[in-house]
């Protein structure tokens, strides 16, 4: 009885142990199954995101083709517009014959207000570098002001002033501004100004600064053209005004003028007729005397018969 009683608890323990092992195994299988269930939606979501990204990439690739086409079309349109603009643009005359100046860019088509031409902008233009000999912008008996060739803005260019000496190298002055003021000395001086743009010479002009005595002599020896010009202009204006008044008088009194000229022409015609008649009478009276003896001879011959 004791052996059976001892065997029963051992069997119960074995059965309990097996049950616990089975429960642990079942729990482990549930965990693995639940993990697989969680992983499957994640994999599905990853697949969906990959498919969405692929569709977006395809859409982008499809959208890139028309963008390139549109850019090519836009470039072609810009080229055509540029060509038409070149054909429709004219350039005005440059404001200078040498050095650097400005000119107008004129549009001949597409102007606002239906105008045939309009100024689009103003741009820089350049002529020959050598401008020869210039004149001071202002001078008096004591000094003279010289100016280099430039346009606005003045500080855009670099200016190099030189003192010219015969048979010697020119002396570069320290002044680097566009205007140079010189005091007259006992001998005439010659200066040169070079205008540089990015170390490239765009203009060069020379000046002569005379002495005070030379300046006075030049002013005194200069013909008084101003007075002559004023006199000629005054006489011309007076003559023009007189002619205008005469024309106005003739237009207003055209009938009287016409009758006056008609009577005058008739009087001249009468005088011409009288003179022609007098000429005829004088020619008839001035016949040759040989005509009369001929008639007398005829009469005598008839009487003798």
UniProtKB/Swiss-Prot annotation:
Record key words, sorted: Cytoplasmic vesicle, Glycoprotein, Membrane, Phosphoprotein, Signal, Transmembrane, Transmembrane helix
GO cellular component terms, semicolon-separated: acrosomal membrane; acrosomal vesicle; inner acrosomal membrane
PTM section of the record: N-glycosylated.
Subcellular location: Cytoplasmic vesicle, Secretory vesicle, Acrosome inner membrane
Single biological process term from Gene Ontology: acrosome assembly
Transmembrane segments: 232-252
Signal sequence range: 1-28
Primary localisation category: membrane
Alphabetized InterPro entries for the sequence: SPACA1
Modified residues (Phosphoserine): 266, 288, 301
Tissue specificity as recorded in UniProt: Testis specific (at protein level).
Disruption phenotype: Males are sterile, while female fertility is not affected. Spermatozoa have significantly impaired swimming ability. The sperm head has a rounded shape instead of the normal hook-shaped morphology. The acrosome membrane does not associate normally with the nuclear envelope or intermediate filament bundles, and fails to expand along the nuclear surface. The sperm nucleus remains globular and mitochondria appear disorganized.
Spans within the Cytoplasmic topological domain: 253-305
Protein's UniProt name: Sperm acrosome membrane-associated protein 1
Species annotation: Mus musculus
Taxonomic lineage: Eukaryota, Metazoa, Chordata, Craniata, Vertebrata
């Amino acid at each position: 009885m004791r052996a059976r009683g001892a065997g029963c608890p051992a069997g119960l323990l074995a059965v309990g142990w097996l049950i616990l092992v089975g429960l642990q195994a079942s729990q482990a299988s549930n965990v693995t199954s639940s993990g697989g269930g969680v992983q499957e939606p994640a994999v599905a979501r990853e697949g969906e995101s990959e498919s969405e990204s692929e569709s977006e990439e395809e859409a982008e690739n499809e959208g890139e083709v028309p963008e390139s086409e549109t850019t090519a079309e836009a470039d072609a349109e810009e080229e055509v517009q540029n060509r038409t603009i070149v054909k429709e643009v004219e350039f005005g005359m440059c404001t200078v014959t040498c050095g650097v100046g400005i000119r107008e860019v004129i549009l001949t088509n597409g102007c606002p207000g239906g105008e045939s031409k309009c100024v689009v902008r103003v741009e820089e233009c350049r002529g020959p570098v050598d401008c020869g000999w210039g004149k001071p912008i202002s001078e008096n008996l004591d000094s003279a002001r010289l100016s280099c060739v430039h346009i606005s803005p003045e500080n855009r260019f670099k200016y190099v002033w030189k003192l010219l000496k015969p048979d010697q190298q020119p002396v570069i002055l320290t002044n680097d501004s566009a205007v140079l003021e010189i005091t007259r000395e006992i001998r005439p001086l010659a200066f040169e100004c070079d205008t540089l743009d990015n170390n490239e010479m765009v203009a060069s002009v020379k000046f002569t600064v005379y002495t005070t005595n030379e300046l006075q002599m030049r002013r005194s020896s200069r013909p008084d053209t101003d007075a002559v010009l004023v006199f000629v202009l005054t006489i011309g204006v007076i003559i023009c005004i007189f002619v205008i008044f005469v024309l106005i008088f003739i237009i207003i009194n055209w009938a009287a003028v016409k009758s006056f000229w008609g009577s005058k022409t008739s009087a001249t015609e009468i005088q011409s007729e009288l003179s022609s008649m007098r000429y005829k009478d004088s020619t008839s009276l001035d016949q040759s005397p040989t005509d009369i003896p001929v008639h007398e001879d005829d009469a005598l011959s008839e009487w003798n018969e």
